């Protein structure tokens, strides 16, 4: 009988690319230190949202200003995690600007 392999998939999302890269590096280093294999970080496509607003509250319809928000995403797969890996990931402190979703498969 074949033993089923365990995998943890972590998706990170944030507006600041530097903060996101530091967080992924922390997660990868923690997982490798506890003996798990790591696939990634895989950069996913960046979502770009552009908002156009009027510069003036009353007239000058042609005068507009554009703002954009870029959402950067990363994907990390942790293969064959141990109990130490899961405990270390729970104790890891991530910055407030990074959204994390963890899925066990």
Curated annotation (Swiss-Prot):
InterPro entries: Ribosomal_uS10, Ribosomal_uS10_CS, Ribosomal_uS10_dom, Ribosomal_uS10_dom_sf
Alphabetical list of SMART domains matching this protein: Ribosomal_S10 (SM01403)
A single Gene Ontology CC term: ribosome
SUPFAM superfamilies hit by this protein: Ribosomal protein S10
Keywords: Ribonucleoprotein, Ribosomal protein
Any one GO molecular-function label of the UniProt entry: structural constituent of ribosome
GO BP: translation
Record's function text: Involved in the binding of tRNA to the ribosomes.
Quaternary structure and interacting proteins, as annotated: Part of the 30S ribosomal subunit.
Similarity annotation: Belongs to the universal ribosomal protein uS10 family.
Stated name of the protein: Small ribosomal subunit protein uS10
Source species: Chlamydia felis (strain Fe/C-56) (Chlamydophila felis)
Gene: rpsJ
């Amino acid at each position: 009988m074949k033993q089923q392999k365990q995998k943890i998939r972590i998706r990170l999302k944030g507006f600041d690319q530097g903060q996101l890269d530091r967080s992924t590096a922390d997660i990868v280093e923690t997982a490798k230190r506890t003996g798990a294999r790591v696939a990634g970080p895989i950069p996913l496509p960046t979502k770009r949202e552009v908002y156009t607003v009027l510069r003036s509250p009353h007239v000058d319809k042609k005068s507009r200003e554009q703002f954009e928000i870029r959402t950067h995403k990363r994907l990390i797969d942790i293969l064959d995690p141990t109990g130490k890996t899961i405990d270390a990931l729970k104790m890891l402190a991530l910055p407030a600007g990074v959204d994390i979703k963890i899925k066990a498969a």
